[in-house]
Amino acid sequence: MPGFAALRLIWEPRMLSILRIMVGVLYTEHGLAKMVDFPHQPNHAPYALFTLVPGLQGLLEVVGGLLLALGLFTRTVAFILAGNMAVAYFMAHTPRGFFPLLNGGELVIVYCFIFLYFW
């Protein structure tokens, strides 16, 4: 029976790939919801496409998520998206309160640190 170190060598790259693909797909879904309202969210209208903050945010989420899911330019994209999430947290969530659970920013923080991990 192989030891833990041997199992880790076999499964670690596979699990990191699955994590990267799933984060990329889910992040793309967030961008599509912002840009074209797919999947539809009740009480939510899509943002104007090339407005400065929400439109650019949606575009970064779609393009960055697809690149991340495909494994293209992963480190560069992850660095850009981590910075994007940090800015989004401080611009959109911090004014609503200090604690991430109360200001709706916990998912933004999770994405930011996952992107930093991929960087």
Enumerate the language-model features and the residues they cover.
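Extended, low-polarity transmembrane helix blocks
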Residues: 1-36, 54-59, 63, 70-119
